[in-house]
């Protein structure tokens, strides 16, 4: 056995030998280490060149030499390691050629026997390469191995030699303290002091830390105060604690002692140099997450910190920390977070402390939310068809299983199918009638799919499934057998309230038009009722009531039998009216278009007359020769009707035939077709039974009017309808009663357009044919819910013909009898345009001589501005329409905007307007397919070919005016600008627009219009300020001027007059400003403004009446006394109660019909309801009463009193008359009497100006004459503002002679008041009480007039 000393000497010998040999070796040669053992590592490069520095001096190179030493006795290992650690480096060597230094000697690998195996373990800072750390080779008892990482112990010698490798480089962030004073130059990297410190310290650091295995370098990074704290970085492999202490000692020894380095202040921090593992890699909400921190150091001082909240983590119900030491060389700490939430996301720090070392490792984790996608609601039919509920998760989650649960009143299980790879699960339901018992239809069951991950995360979604039973339909049980013209209904009841669609079909599969049936949904079922008000033969057949839910159909069937019976309107009688000689007879007949099995009789009164049947091709007539002699007396009118009875014993009466029995000598006109008549007699006959040529195959329609003139019948009016148009009219009447009218409509519109185009000449000379076409369009416009481009083209082609210039004269004749035909036509065209749906085809554009149309379809939420221009060169007219895109954004997608322009329609619509009101311009109508409640604004520009005279108005055609016959209305429209030839209108709604001239209204831009505006605004403004000042003055002097009952009531009236007029004027000026500035005021706000203006102006008048009655009472009933509270109650009831009652009644009587306000201004309506009378009549009555009171007062003042000289009396009387008029006129509202002059048309504009001036300045008059002219008010104001001396002198002077108060008992005027109504002289009162009473009464009169 060799001694340790000998072994150590041998090792030193080998080291020195190797060093000397290395000096003579070629750099490119491979050098194998010497060994005391025969083993040499094969294929391993034993000598590695580490560094070569090229300089001008001899090159210094560094080598790493691996030496293997084998011992027969393992006890030699520790002494050798101790010896090597005791060496001081570098060890200098000498050679004749070069100097060789040994910088460090480190033990890397130690192999020892362990049973039958050899375990080779790595020293600190070294480890086996990853590729050698196989699971079956590592030392399980001593090593904790994580796949993909270094291991520290192997069971056998590696094939390439037993050498552990240096581990990856780490950067040690270190600091040490120098116990010297800190200088500011150390903060400046360019200062000499900084460079000196840095150089000296780095030199010492390199000498000291050079002994560390894998040392690469050291850098001083800065200095901090606190003595001097040096921060620096050391780049090396992970060192052992023993080595780092040894290196620190060498640093202190190498550094100049003047730096006073404190050995105990060394600290080292490594960041993210530890192994940090997070499981799972992708974290989802609810997972159990493990964070493992591993470092090959022996320390159990490990802590965890949550950086987001600077929170030190401790063991709890959600967090658990486990720390352990493995292999006596590795510290492992594990943080487990249970049921992680998004609030736990952030950066986590694992901190391990060992001596001077702090090892920090940081990891930021994100918590992903779990999103389970599923249909929120589903409806499932209980028809045994499979329905799948699907749930899928978003994100790459490692799901382990999916569970389905259900909760509800009924239990309907399904079959789950889960595809973990696609993160989806399907639950298939197959519900049948047994699982959905009666009454359970509509029951809701909640199905929950819950996804569970391998790490504990759970995500779920609820699917609300409503189970629908197959509908059981119950249809009207009674047989339906009706006759033509009668109504019938079929009721179809479902015991299920859930359905997607309900419709009715004929047996041929034709859908019944939806206008014929209504469907209602109830809690426990549904009901659909097919109602036919006028049955025809087309309704004869079988009908199916169909409830559809998804692909399930429930059908109920009902047969309908319709027996032939002519409709009353289709029975043609002749004559409509006739004259019959009392001794003669007359042929009467009733005709129908289709034959049938009918029993027909004629009836007059209680008598029944037989009928003879006559068939003439398609026309079937029943005739009777009426004998006038059968009537008991002559000069009588007899009504005769036909009575049709069919096989079902249902009957119908024809229109009545009126026979006028007259003596034969009165008859002068005779005609075999028209009949007989007396002079001046006017009768109507159906055109087909008149002298107008007609054929049974193509009968004409309409009526013709004859008048007996002399001995001849003259044609007075011809309203006959040509045969082709009459045929179209009859077809239209039948179409709207047909069950398949929507399918027949396109073909009919095409035939109508072709026929009207061919019959243009006949229409231009036949008012009856023109009226028939209008009736046809009106009937058909109620049919469609959707109109395509082709149908709209046919409609406009028809309209183009009947609006042509050749037909305009026919319109005049037509509207002499039917005034609403033009409005009816316009309404029909608007209804067609509102139903226009272009679908996928381009928007329709139509242009003809008399009508043009443009349209646009809203396809997106950001449409373009709607701009259309229409030009009619033949009429020299044009117009533009603009709707800003901001208003179009409020419309539904696929909405259609349609604008049509008509150059001749205004002349037709305006025939009831005065000629000088007519402005020659287009009529443009704009409609939207879907109604909108959002604010709307349309701008239109018209060319006006009648620019002269009056104010231009923007108007629209209001179909509800004039008992729904229509009329021009300006509500919601105003003129934005106009230069005479062109007018731009702005409106807040859609319909048909045009412009009119208003000759009676001054042009707002004229001098007169501007003058009236200035007077109104300035006057009302002054009035408001004056009234406010009046109220302020009254408030200031109130206590001083209301010391007796009369003064109190006088000032109470004045205050309420001023307050009511102030509020009324404020409302007035606000509304006027809004309308003058063309702001759109909503109808509700306009109604409210009108109500308050009405109420407060009426209050002004009634308080004026109260003041007048108070004056009359105090002057007439001098000795009558009434308490203040009674007078006050009566005054307020009269002043506010009466106006409120009148205003509320007016509003309640007119607003339900929307005729409370005017069309273009917020004030009481006049044209439709005469609501203005609710203001005018009370106001005029009050003015008359106050005028009467004024006359009485002035008359009594003028009456002479005893003892006055005539000249003095005359002067005093004139003064009192002037003062009374000046006070009473503004106070009692006499100026409103001028309003009578403005009511009548054609009134001189001077009266308008006078009326405006007097009334708008009424507030100023009340302030001056009703308030400030009162002596008591003046005295109170003077006293209030401390002018006591002047007031005292004034009082003294006014107490003498002529300054005696004019209404004191001693004054002549007071005596005159006492002599009212024939009483003369004065009262001689002997008691103090009576004197006091007389004084109060006298002062009462004074306070009323002053």
From Swiss-Prot:
Bilayer-crossing regions: 1007-1027, 1054-1074, 1091-1111, 1129-1149, 1174-1194, 1221-1241, 1245-1265
GO terms classed as biological process: adenylate cyclase-activating G protein-coupled receptor signaling pathway; cell surface receptor signaling pathway; energy reserve metabolic process; erythrocyte development; fat cell differentiation; G protein-coupled receptor signaling pathway; glomerular filtration; glucose homeostasis
Subcellular location: Cell membrane
Modified residues (Phosphoserine): 1307
Signal peptide: 1-21
Effect of residue 1161 to A: No effect on activation by exogenous agonist
UniProt keywords, alphabetically: Cell membrane, Disulfide bond, G-protein coupled receptor, Glycoprotein, Immunoglobulin domain, Membrane, Phosphoprotein, Receptor, Repeat, Signal, Transducer, Transmembrane, Transmembrane helix
Residues under site feature: Cleavage: 51-52, 226-227, 990-991
Region of interest called GPS, as start-end residue ranges on this chain: 954-1003
Residue ranges constituting the GAIN-B domain according to the UniProt record: 842-1003
Membrane topology field: Multi-pass membrane protein
Tissue specificity remark: Expressed in lung endothelial cells and in alveolar type II (ATII) cells (at protein level). Expressed high levels in subcutaneous adipose tissue in lean individuals and at lower levels in visceral fat. Expression levels in subcutaneous adipose tissue drastically drop in obese individuals.
Record topological domains on the Cytoplasmic side: 1028-1053, 1112-1128, 1195-1220, 1266-1346
PROSITE patterns, alphabetized: G_PROTEIN_RECEP_F2_2, G_PROTEIN_RECEP_F2_4, GAIN_B, IG_LIKE, SEA
A cellular component annotation (GO) from this entry: apical part of cell
Activity control mechanisms: As an adhesion G protein-coupled receptor (aGPCR) exhibits a large N-terminal extracellular domain containing highly conserved GPCR autoproteolysis-inducing (GAIN) domain. During synthesis, intracellular autoproteolytic processing of nascent chain within the GAIN domain generates a mature protein, consisting of an N-terminal fragment that is non-covalently linked to the C-terminal fragment. The mature protein is routed to the plasma membrane where the N- and C-terminal fragments remain associated, forming the holoreceptor.
Phosphothreonine modification, residue list: 1300
Biased composition range(s): Low complexity: 1329-1346
Residues covered by region (Disordered): 1327-1346
SEA domain segment(s): 166-273
Topology, Extracellular side: 22-1006, 1075-1090, 1150-1173, 1242-1244
Effect after changing residue 1153 to Q: No effect on activation by exogenous agonist
InterPro entries named in the record: Adhesion_GPCR (IPR051587), GAIN_B (IPR057244), GAIN_dom_sf (IPR046338), GPCR_2-like_7TM (IPR017981), GPCR_2_Ig-hepta-like_rcpt (IPR008078), GPCR_2_secretin-like (IPR000832), GPCR_2_secretin-like_CS (IPR017983), GPS (IPR000203)
Record's subunit section: Homodimer; disulfide-linked. Heterodimer of 2 chains generated by proteolytic processing; the large extracellular N-terminal fragment and the membrane-bound C-terminal fragment predominantly remain associated and non-covalently linked. Fragment generates by the processing enzyme furin remains attached to the extracellular N-terminal fragment. Interacts (via N-terminal extracellular domain) with SFTPD.
Protein name (database record): Adhesion G protein-coupled receptor F5
Organism: Homo sapiens
Organism classification: Eukaryota, Metazoa, Chordata, Craniata, Vertebrata
């Amino acid at each position: 056995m060799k001694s340790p000393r000998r072994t150590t000497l041998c090792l030193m010998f080998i080291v020195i030998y190797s060093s000397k040999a290395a000096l003579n070796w070629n750099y490119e040669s491979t050098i194998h280490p010497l060994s005391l053992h025969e083993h040499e590592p094969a294929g391993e490069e034993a000598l590695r060149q580490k560094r070569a520095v090229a300089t001008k001096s001899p090159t210094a190179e560094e080598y790493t030499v691996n030496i293997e030493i084998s011992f027969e006795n393992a006890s030699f290992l520790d002494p050798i390691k101790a010896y090597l650690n005791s060496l001081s480096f570098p060890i200098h060597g000498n050679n004749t050629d070069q100097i060789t230094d040994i910088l460090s000697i480190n033990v890397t690998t130690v192999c020892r026997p362990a049973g039958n195996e050899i375990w080779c373990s790595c020293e600190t800072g070294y480890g086996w390469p990853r590729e050698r750390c196989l699971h079956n080779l590592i030392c399980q008892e001593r090593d904790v191995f994580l796949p993909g990482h270094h291991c520290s112990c192997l069971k056998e010698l590696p094939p390439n030699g037993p050498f552990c490798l240096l581990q990856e480089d780490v950067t040690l962030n270190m600091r040490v303290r120098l116990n010297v004073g800190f200088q500011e130059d150390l903060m400046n990297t360019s200062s000499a002091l900084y460079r000196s410190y840095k150089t000296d310290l780095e030199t010492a650091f390199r000498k000291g830390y050079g002994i560390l295995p894998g040392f690469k370098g050291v850098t001083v990074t800065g200095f901090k105060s606190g003595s001097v704290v040096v921060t620096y970085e050391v780049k090396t492999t992970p060192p052992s604690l023993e080595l780092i202490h040894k290196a620190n000692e060498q640093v202190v020894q190498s550094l100049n002692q003047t730096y006073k380095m404190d050995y105990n202040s060394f600290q080292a921090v490594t960041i993210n140099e530890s192994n940090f593992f997070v499981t799972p890699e992708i974290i989802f909400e609810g997972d159990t997450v493990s964070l493992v921190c591993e470092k090959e150091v022996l320390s159990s001082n490990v802590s965890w910190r949550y950086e987001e909240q600077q929170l030190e983590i401790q063991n709890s119900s959600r967090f658990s920390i486990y720390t352990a030491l493995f292999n006596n060389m590795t510290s492992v700490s594990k943080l487990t977070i249970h049921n992680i939430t998004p609030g736990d996301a952030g950066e986590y720090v694992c901190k391990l402390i060992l001596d001077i070392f702090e090892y920090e490792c940081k990891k930021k984790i994100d918590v992903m939310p779990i999103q389970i996608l599923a249909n929120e609601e589903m409806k499932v039919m209980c028809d045994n068809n499979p329905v799948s509920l699907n749930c899928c998760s978003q994100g790459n989650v490692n799901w382990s299983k999916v569970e389905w649960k259900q909760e509800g009143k009924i239990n309907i299980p399904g079959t789950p199918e889960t595809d973990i790879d696609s993160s989806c699960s399907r639950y298939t339901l197959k519900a049948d009638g047994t699982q959905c018992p009666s009454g359970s239809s509509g029951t809701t069951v909640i199905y929950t799919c819950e996804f569970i991950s391998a790490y504990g995360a759970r995500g779920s979604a609820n699917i609300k499934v409503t189970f629908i039973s197959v509908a059981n339909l119950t249809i009207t049980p009674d047989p339906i057998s009706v006759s033509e013209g009668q109504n019938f209904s079929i009721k179809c009841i479902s015991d299920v309230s859930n359905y997607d669609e309900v419709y009715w079909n004929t047996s041929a599969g034709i859908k019944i038009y939806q206008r014929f049936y209504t469907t209602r949904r109830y809690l426990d079922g549904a009901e659909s009722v097919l109602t036919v008000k006028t049955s025809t033969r087309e309704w004869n057949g079988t009908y199916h009531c169909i409830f559809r839910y998804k692909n399930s159909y429930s059908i109920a069937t009902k047969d309908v039998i319709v027996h032939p019976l002519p409709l009353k309107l289709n029975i043609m009688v002749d004559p409509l009216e006739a004259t019959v000689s009392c001794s003669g007879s007359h042929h009467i007949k009733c005709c129908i278009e289709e034959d049938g099995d009918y029993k027909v009789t004629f009836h007059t009164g209680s008598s029944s007359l037989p009928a003879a049947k006559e068939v003439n091709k398609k026309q079937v007539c029943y005739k009777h020769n009426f004998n006038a002699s059968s009537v008991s007396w002559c000069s009588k009118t007899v009504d005769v009707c036909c009575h049709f009875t069919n096989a079902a014993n249902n009957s119908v009466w024809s229109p009545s035939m009126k026979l006028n029995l007259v003596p034969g000598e009165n008859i002068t006109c005779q005609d075999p077709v028209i009949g007989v008549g007396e002079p001046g007699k006017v009768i109507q006959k159906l055109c087909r039974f008149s002298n107008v040529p007609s054929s049974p195959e193509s009968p004409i329609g309409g009526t013709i009017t004859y008048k007996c003139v002399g001995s001849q019948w003259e044609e007075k009016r011809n309203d006959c309808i040509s045969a082709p148009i009459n045929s179209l009219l009859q077809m239209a009447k039948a179409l709207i009663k047909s069950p398949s009218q929507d399918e027949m409509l396109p073909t009919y519109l095409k035939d109508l357009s072709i026929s009207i185009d061919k019959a243009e000449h006949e229409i231009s000379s036949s008012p009856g044919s023109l009226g028939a076409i209008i009736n046809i369009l009106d009937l058909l416009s109620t049919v469609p819910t959707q109109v395509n481009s082709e149908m709209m083209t046919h409609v406009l082609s028809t309209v183009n013909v009947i609006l042509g210039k050749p037909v305009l004269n026919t319109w005049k004749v037509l509207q002499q009898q039917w005034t609403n035909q033009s409005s009816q036509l316009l309404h029909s065209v608007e209804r067609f345009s509102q139903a226009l749906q272009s679908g996928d085809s381009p928007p329709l554009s139509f242009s003809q001589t008399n009508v043009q149309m443009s349209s646009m379809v809203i396809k997106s939420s950001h449409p373009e501005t709607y701009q259309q221009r229409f030009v009619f060169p033949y009429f020299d007219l044009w117009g533009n329409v603009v709707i800003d895109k901001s208003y179009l954004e409020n419309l539904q997608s696929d909405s259609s905007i349609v604008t049509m322009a008509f150059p001749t329609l205004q002349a037709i619509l305006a025939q009831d307007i005065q000629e000088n009101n007519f402005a020659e311009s287009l009529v443009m109508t704009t409609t939207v397919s879907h109604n909108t409640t959002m604010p709307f604004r349309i701008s239109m520009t018209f060319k006006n070919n009648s620019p002269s005279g009056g104010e231009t108005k923007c108007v629209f055609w209001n179909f509800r005016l004039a008992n729904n016959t229509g009329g021009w209305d300006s509500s919601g429209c105003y003129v934005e600008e106009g230069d005479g030839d062109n007018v731009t209108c702005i409106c807040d709604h859609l319909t048909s627009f045009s412009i009119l001239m208003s000759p009676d209204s001054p042009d707002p831009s004229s001098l007169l219009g501007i003058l009236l505006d200035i007077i109104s605004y300035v006057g009302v403004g002054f009035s408001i300020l004056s009234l406010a000042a009046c109220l302020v003055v009254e408030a200031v002097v109130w206590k001083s001027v209301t010391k007796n009952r009369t003064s109190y009531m006088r000032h109470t009236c004045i205050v309420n007059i001023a307050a009511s007029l102030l509020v009324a004027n404020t409302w007035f000026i606000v509304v006027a400003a809004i309308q003058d500035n063309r702001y759109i005021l909503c109808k509700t706000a306009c109604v409210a403004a009108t109500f308050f203006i009405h109420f407060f102006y009426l209050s002004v008048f009634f308080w004026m009446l109260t003041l007048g009655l108070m004056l009359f009472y105090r002057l007439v009933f001098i000795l009558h006394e009434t308490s203040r509270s009674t007078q006050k109650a009566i005054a307020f009831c009269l002043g506010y109660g009466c106006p409120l009652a009148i205003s509320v009644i007016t509003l309640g009587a007119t607003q339900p019909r929307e005729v409370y306000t005017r069309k273009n201004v917020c004030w009481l309506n006049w044209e439709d309801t005469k609501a203005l009378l609710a203001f005018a009549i009370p106001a005029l009555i009050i003015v008359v009463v106050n005028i009467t009171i004024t006359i009485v007062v002035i008359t009594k003042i003028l009456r002479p009193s005893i003892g006055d000289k005539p000249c003095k009396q005359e002067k005093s009387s004139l003064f009192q008359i002037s003062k009374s008029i000046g006070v009473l006129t503004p106070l009692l509202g006499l100026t409103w009497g001028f309003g009578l002059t403005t009511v009548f048309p054609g009134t001189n504009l001077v009266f308008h100006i006078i009326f405006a001036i007097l009334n708008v300045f009424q507030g100023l008059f009340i302030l001056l004459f009703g308030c400030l002219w009162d002596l008591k008010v003046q005295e109170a104001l003077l006293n209030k503002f401390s002018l006591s001396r002047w007031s005292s002198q004034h009082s003294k002077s006014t107490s003498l002679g002529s300054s005696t108060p004019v209404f004191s008992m001693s004054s002549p005027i007071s005596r005159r008041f006492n002599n009212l109504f024939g009483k003369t002289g004065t009262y001689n009162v002997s008691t103090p009480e009576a004197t006091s009473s007389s004084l109060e009464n006298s002062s009462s009169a004074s306070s009323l007039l002053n």
